[in-house]
Amino acid sequence: MISFVFPGQGSQRIGMGEDLFGRYPELTAKADHILGYSIQELCRDGERLNQTQFTQPALYVVNALSYLKKTEETGLKPDFTAGHSLGEYNALYASGAFDFEEGLQLVKKRGELMSRAKGGGMAAVIGLTHEQVTDVLRENHLDMIDIANMNTPQQIVISGYKEDIEKAASVFEAVNGVKMVHRLNVSGAFHSRYMLEAKEEFSRFIESFHFKPLSIPVISNVTARPYEQRELKETLTGQITGSVNWTDSIRFLMGRKNMSFEEIGPGKVLTGLIQRITAEAEPITDEIKVPAEAGKSSITAASLGNEEFKRDYQLKYAYLAGGMYRGISSKEMVVKLAEKGMMGFFGTGGLNIAHVEDAILSIQHELRDGGSFGINVVHNMKHTDSEEKMIDLLLKHGIQNLEASAFLTVTPALVRFRAKGLKRGAGGQIIARQRIIAKLSRPEVAEAFLSPAPDHILQKLAAENKITAEEASLMREIPVAHDICVEADSGGHTDGGVAYSLMPAIIRLRDDMMKKYRYGKTVRIGAAGGIGTPEAAMAAFMLGADFIVTGSINQCTVEAATSGLVKDLLQQMNVQDTAYAPAGDMFESGSKVQVLKKGLFFPTRASKLHELYQRHRSIEEIDEKTLRQIEEKYFKASVSSIYDKVKAHYSNEDISKAERNPKEKMALIFKWYFRQSSASAIKGDPDAKVDFQIHCGPALGAFNQWVKGTELESWKNRHADGIGMRLMEETASLLNQKLGSFLQTC
């Protein structure tokens, strides 16, 4: 077994963390934002580095980054963690009690409060045991002195007013057996009764934080035993005035089987202390108390999914909301999700560049203080120039997260997006600013995105000066996709895949590709399609999903940019109320989309148009009765008037092709119906209701049944962020129940 131990104040040194800040630029930037100054500059500033309000945040950050580096390089997770004073916050961070930012906020406040303490002093008495030091204090009526630290069996730190410490130091220097009395360079009486005011203010501050269940036992400085979840806040707050019982903490860990220790952070102060303790003291063999409720609360909404994924995307939850065409996944939806620690993708399909740019600027303004979001880009096989323009726009505005949908292969535009800004970090790792989450459902497509970019594309982009030679070189060492989203049967474009088959296959493919190309960073695999209930989300995580992506359920929320009439229809649907219909944007190929069918004629009429397209070479070949039905029932206008609208919509080049090819002309006329059916639905035109094209999967039907009889039964009470949090919380609860039941039967 192994314990990771984290040092506290006194271990700081000038230049610490220099090899870490470049390796973790996003966390370093977060630290700078929280602290209001550069953490890297602080660690170079010897004067500030020795001031409590700066020392503690600096050590916390360096310890935390050291831990991440250690786990990433070795894959090693400790069996226990402990930290000396300030270092205990890193032990709790490693155990998952809070994330990096929350821990830094706590440490910043702690350092500020402790730095206010004036007139105090501390001294280390070396050569006497805790009992002997206590006897000397009592015999000499030094009752204003507290024991602050028990660092080793014979290194005891005392704390109190400066004049009392001076008096006590003189007494101890005359005591037989004392090897040295070392006065510490501090201004406060830390870990003593004199920190009560700081403790009380910190107690009020910590109240607003929600600590997650510990995934690794953490040894408390105060009790020298593992933290109990229900007493976490009280124990951590009590550390400010309580003694740091480091000796018994290590003795307790020594009592576990074959325990080894590794110090994580700057210096080797704790390593030296542990060597003294193991040489001078016996192990404590108390049994570890496991709280009865621990099994019931081991999994939380925030602990679901891959931790590195959440850290990379700066998320609290491993929960994404996929892009929906024509901006149905609206800017309002994206902002709502970001504010709650989730991520949504603005849907650009069917929108012009100006509309998308306005949305990006609006979202960036709303999230100027933080929050992650992305842009969904749908592949357009016929108009790759529009894809290039979209990538230009995303790069122009510094968009980092792209959800790639309906791509059957890797395109130059995607490669260019991924390549821009690539650089090699100080530790040799490749730092990718732009991230692509490839949404796919076929292994051959996954293989393309899990491979480095094709060399011919890189050479062409470099020759055209669209990427640099260095960017092209680095692209040969990383996959095109930062992460993969495996899309099972879903609303909209779908291959009708089955998650139980797809997820294991793609995960194994990912593992094979990781070995083949020896990538330095794992590609995470997420799950989408059919996720609308806790049971479905649980199944996704149990299949190995690092994150989940919802879609259909978000279309029936207040934030969805579609009509109330559509939401009324969606609210009433059940799992059987969908059908497959031809996709308007891929009409000629026969690709399918899944749509709502209950009370609508669109699925039938769309299929009829595609059947006619397949059977006839031109619209003139269609018999008069059928053509009249199309004009009166489908188009509610003559074919000639529809073609006039088509000519106004498409480019001269497209119309020229249509004039030369009657079948192409027929396709453009029929595709007008698909565009109009979507536009009418979004607008909420009651006269065109039966022709509404509403992309949707069975997940929403399952969701409707789940929330039936609750306040969420009405879409007017459904908000994308609230749905996301509720789904994750209920999934965590369900997992705990199922695991508990499973363990009881074993």
Swiss-Prot record:
Enzyme class, broadest EC rank: transferase
Keywords: Acyltransferase, Antibiotic biosynthesis, Cytoplasm, Transferase
Its EC number(s): 2.3.1.39
Ranges for region Acyl transferase: 1-312
Pathway this chain belongs to: Antibiotic biosynthesis; bacillaene biosynthesis
GO terms assigned for molecular function: [acyl-carrier-protein] S-malonyltransferase activity
SMART domains: PKS_AT
One GO cellular component term: cytosol
One Pfam family cited in the UniProt record for this chain: Acyl_transf_1
Active-site residues, as the UniProt record annotates them: 85, 191
Family: In the N-terminal section; belongs to the FabD family.
Stored NCBIfam families: fabD, pfaD_fam
Free-text function comment from the UniProt entry: Probably involved in some intermediate steps for the synthesis of the antibiotic polyketide bacillaene which is involved in secondary metabolism. Probably has an acyl transferase activity and could also have a flavin mononucleotide-dependent oxidoreductase activity.
Name the UniProt record assigns to this protein: Polyketide biosynthesis protein BaeE
Species annotation: Bacillus velezensis (strain DSM 23117 / BGSC 10A6 / LMG 26770 / FZB42)
Gene that specifies this protein: baeE
